[in-house]
């Protein structure tokens, strides 16, 4: 590793208010499907779920906050969401 390379910050677990942002196609029921998938893996703070549509209405961003317990949990959430076919990105 050179001096100019930057390491990703290490996440310390558990994180009780870990933000997850999901960018997906806009579609009926997609928000509920996203929440159901995440709830299979983590507790969600239901009071902190936010939904926004893109200016043209093609995409929807869902931001929610979870209790993150480990890296495997985050990987599994990401993998299952991406496998839906309508989720484009998980941040």
Swiss-Prot record:
The cross-references to InterPro entries, in alphabetical order and at most eight, read: UPF0250_YbeD-like, YbeD-like_sf
Pfam families per record: DUF493 (PF04359)
Q: Which GO terms describe its cellular component?
A: cytosol
SS bond list: none
- Write out the similarity annotation: Belongs to the UPF0250 family.
Q: Which HAMAP family does the UniProt entry name for this protein?
A: UPF0250
| Protein name, entry field | UPF0250 protein Pfl01_4965
